[in-house]
Amino acid sequence: MALRTDAENRLRQIGSDQWSDPETGSRAIAKWHQHVEDGRTWVILDEADSILGTVSRGPADRDFWNETDQLHTAFYLYKLIISQDAAGTGIGSLVLDWACRVAALEGRRWLRIDCWRTAHGLQRYYEGLGFAHVRTEAPSHRKSGWLAQRPSGTILNPDRCLSVDSGEPLSIPATRDARG
């Protein structure tokens, strides 16, 4: 939870109510706890076992994705949080590559995400990592809804792959330039 709280504080500092909105925050936390309990959340560790981040997967969010999206063809990624200390190191890109590899191994064509509709910087980040905007949904009870997907065959960091062994923490491999 500390990573989540830290992320909420960082977002609040830049003027965003993402993840701390009083109307949607408690539902989001409950959903995240369910991902953890169901074994659909991974912790990202460095070689010293320091926590660098976390990521979850889950079923298609039916507030956004529907049958015409061919739900079964995608891996749905949620709650990618990178610690402040690890921000800007490329770990997010490694995790997205990992998710693409898992999706491909499962025979899925897409890695799909949704993010806050007003998080334009985050949307540009994902587009820079190979995601294409599919559409934006705006149900009245949600503030997320910017939907994007990336082909599961898209691997941007082939020399720094994370292990796809399920149930294990995601360990970041050391490199000469850890900031790469």
Describe the predicted segments one by one.
Residues 5-31:
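Conserved GNAT-fold acetyl-CoA-binding loop/helix
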Residues 27-43, 76:
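A short helix-loop-beta-strand connector motif used in the catalytic cores of GNAT acetyltransferases and
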Residues 38-55:
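Conserved beta-hairpin
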Residues 54-83, 87:
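Conserved acyl-donor/pantetheine-binding loop and adjacent beta-alpha core of acyl/acetyltransferases
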Residues 96, 103-115:
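Conserved GNAT acetyl-CoA-binding A-motif
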Residues 113-123, 139-144:
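Conserved beta-strand-loop-alpha-helix junction that forms the acyl-donor binding cleft
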Residues 126-136:
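Conserved acetyl-CoA-binding loop of GNAT-fold acetyltransferases
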